[in-house]
Design a protein with these regions (language model features):
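Beta-propeller domains
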Residues: 87-97, 104-105, 131-154, 164-170, ...
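Short glycine/acidic-rich loop motifs that flank beta-strands on beta-rich extracellular proteins
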Residues: 166-170, 188-196, 202-205, 226-233, ...
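Extracellular polysaccharide-degrading/modifying enzymes targeting complex plant/algal/animal polysaccharides
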Residues: 1-204, 251, 463-466, 498-507, ...
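Predominantly extracellular beta-rich ligand-binding scaffolds that present long acidic/polar faces
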Residues: 342-507, 520
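Extracellular beta-sheet-rich ligand-binding/adhesion modules
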Residues: 569-659
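Extracellular beta-strand-rich solenoid/capping regions of secreted or surface-exposed proteins
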Residues: 140-157, 165-175, 203-211, 231-232, ...
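Surface-exposed loop/turn motifs in large extracellular/passenger domains
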Residues: 149-157, 175-178, 188, 203-216, ...
Length: 659
């Protein structure tokens, strides 16, 4: 995550306090870097033994964009921040705050196990080994980006193949193909060690090209990529029941918006996938008229600022349907209908979000107009943000429908809860008591109702509404009811790990208290789903006399994410493990307790080192220097491959090595 990257900021001021604002200026290609960020082996940026000149810089200086540049100068200052220089032509969008970066590409930087350097001048490869004498070991290098290429292929099935350090691509008119039950281990990486020009910094990733339509990727594992997990440029493809984790450890020089899964085609379906531990700020850019459903996503956007799990930009909102997803424990927005540069009129419209759960995220951000936001449960939003934000800017969202949502805070502003013209806007939907049916606009420091002559004014009154929502803000608003503790209305217990069942309704305050609107929205044909009325666009079956408020009906159960157990290549004990228990899934990098098919690494630096308290089997086991492993009395640890112990293993029970 960013916590392990160096940091620094320019000393210029942003033109706005809008967190979505992007500054396209570059300050002469120079960057200040903090001296107190340390490199493990050489003492820190400020150490005169560390010269960054001639290195490769991976610079997250564009908020949600990261660039790979050649460092052309490094001025070391003993009493102040150092300055590095680079060619400004090597970067795109520049933002003057929240800078993170790391450097590589020099032999002198090698100081940690498994680091390597290639000297182009004499074609020599240097490796800092994890253990042992390299003369007795085999070192392999990646030579092929794509081991399988579909070119004009149709009705081909690729099934049960393990891809290691390679992947596939579909080009030409490759249609109706299936990739199923395949494992993609380290499928893509950049070639920037060879240089930063001619596209070497951009990884060649798993891709369905612009004329690859009606294909299916199902029940596959994608892990430890550099670059996007998937790029999809064709139409009506289905990405279903897959497992993605540890996606993109540099997030640099990616395509377009720079996301983890990049779609530009039309009518693609992304459903029942599990995603966790990603680098890029946004997780899924969906393409036009997409369906995003039954996905489970957590721990995203670790290497860039801004972002969302579902990132609906201007052209990708209309016709999108986002439903029955579970997003939790990420610093990013769970779902966002977005607009560039703070201009709400540039946002997309006619999107639908219904029956979603978000817990401990940056919430749900809705810009634009004519959106349908219904039956969502959004809790514990971070950064003092409102859980559901129906943004009231530039006369927008007055034709948006908001109903049967349960949240702690629902507002028209990112964080404010006053809902007054003199402070921050009232809720923008038409029909609000005492409000405007034409939306609101901010002039100087105050808000007012939109009127004829305003740049964003629409002479047709808004047709949206707010009905039967509940939150914890004790301020009167149409369609919103106050409750002091919404978690108490649910089967909520996050202490045992978050699951979908935590959000089942248990209180009569939300059971049978919803509405089932049959209104037909204006321009109903622009929505995805089976319209034209709201009850068709947002399908919902009542368990009782009326709809329940929130994502679930009482007695209803639905699950998200992949429904199978992946065969991970490597599983690492987390240095942030919350306990010493080997059999606790959250203590492992994959979020799953390892089994006999997995290669296990126990690293140094964990505050809780693993203890085996019941018999287990693994494939290969490596205990790094300064790491420990304890096997309790009466249990057996079986290693079916190689055991490499550079640390300390305490055996009170039994250990069997069957290599």
């Amino acid at each position: 995550s960013h916590s392990t990257w160096a940091q620094g900021d320019e000393n210029t001021l942003s033109d706005t306090d809008d967190p979505d604002y992007v500054d396209d200026r570059s300050i002469n290609g120079s960057l200040q870097i903090d001296e107190d960020i340390f490199n493990p082996g050489v003492g820190g940026i400020g150490n005169t033994s560390l010269d960054l000149n001639g290195s490769i810089g991976i610079l997250n200086i564009g908020s949600f964009k990261t660039w790979t540049v050649a460092i052309t100068g490094h001025t070391q200052n003993a009493s102040s921040d150092d300055v590095i220089t680079y060619n400004t032509g090597d970067i795109g969008t520049y933002k003057d705050k929240h800078h993170y970066y790391f450097f590589e590409g020099k032999l002198s930087f090698l100081d940690t196990n498994n680091e390597w350097f290639h000297d182009k001048s004499d074609n020599t490869l240097y490796v800092y080994p994890d253990y042992g004498d390299l003369s007795n070991r085999t070192i392999k290098g990646k030579t092929t980006d794509y081991s399988v290429t579909f070119s004009g292929a149709q009705y081909v099935t690729l099934k049960k193949i393990n891809f290691f350090a390679t992947t596939f691509e579909m080009t030409g008119n490759s249609d109706y193909n299936t990739v199923e039950e395949c494992n993609f281990y380290y499928p893509s990486a950049s070639k920037r060690m060879l240089g930063t020009t001619d596209g070497l910094g951009t990884p060649n990733v798993t891709e369905l090209g612009s004329n690859a339509d009606n294909n299916t990727i199902e029940k596959c594992l994608f892990e430890n990529t550099e670059g996007e997990a998937l790029v999809i440029k064709g139409d009506t493809n289905t990405i279903k029941n897959n497992y993605f984790h540890h996606i993109d450890w540099s997030a640099s020089e990616l395509q377009g918006l720079m996301v983890s899964i990049y779609c530009t085609g039309t009518s693609n379906i992304f459903q029942e996938n599990t995603i966790h531990t990603t680098g890029a700020s946004a997780t899924v850019l969906p393409g036009r008229t997409s369906t995003f459903s039954y996905n489970k996503v957590t721990n995203t956007g670790l290497l860039q600022s801004d972002g969302a799990v579902f990132q609906g930009t201007k052209n990708y909102v209309q016709g999108s349907v986002v439903h029955h997803n579970f997003i939790y424990d990420t610093e990013k927005y769970a779902f966002r209908y977005d607009a560039p540069g703070g201009d709400a009129t540039q946002a997309g419209s006619y999107g639908i979000m219904h029956h979603n759960i978000a817990d401990n995220t940056n919430g749900l951000m809705i810009k634009g107009n004519n959106q349908i936001i219904a039956h969502n449960t959004i809790l514990n939003t971070i950064n003092n943000r409102n859980d559901i934000i129906i943004l009231s800017e530039d006369c927008s969202n007055n034709s948006t429908y908001l109903y049967n949502n349960l949240a702690k805070r629902i507002g028209a502003h990112r964080s404010a809860t006053s809902f007054s013209l003199t402070s921050d806007s009232p809720m923008p939907m038409a029909g609000n008591a005492g409000g405007s049916n034409y939306g609101y606009i901010k002039v100087s420091s105050s808000w007012r109702a939109c009127q004829s002559g305003d740049s964003y004014y629409n002479a047709t009154a808004g047709s949206g509404s707010s009905q039967n929502n509940i939150d914890e803000i004790n301020v009167s608003r149409t369609g919103l009811t106050y409750n002091s503790d919404v978690e108490s209305l649910l089967n909520y217990n996050s202490g045992d790990g978050k699951t979908e069942s935590d959000y089942h309704p248990t209180s009569n305050t939300i059971i049978d208290q919803g509405v089932s609107p049959t209104t037909t929205p204006s321009n109903s044909g622009n929505y995805g789903g089976t319209g034209p009325a709201l009850n068709n666009l947002v399908p919902h079956t009542n368990a009782g006399s009326a709809a329940d408020i929130g994502a679930f009906e009482v007695g209803e159960s639905w699950d998200t994410g992949a429904d199978w157990s992946p065969k991970f290549y490597k599983v690492i004990w987390k240095t942030s493990a919350g306990s010493t228990a080997w059999n606790t899934a959250s203590n492992w990098s994959t979020g799953v307790v390892p089994d006999a098919d997995n290669n296990i690494t126990i690293p140094a630096g964990a505050s809780n080192m693993p203890v085996v308290s019941s018999s287990v089997s693994v494939k290969n086991l490596t205990v790094n220097s300064s790491a420990t492993l304890t096997i309790n009395s009466g249990v057996t640890l079986t290693v079916n491959g190689n055991l490499v112990n550079m640390g300390n293993i305490t055996v009170n029970g039994e250990i069997n090595v069957n290599n």
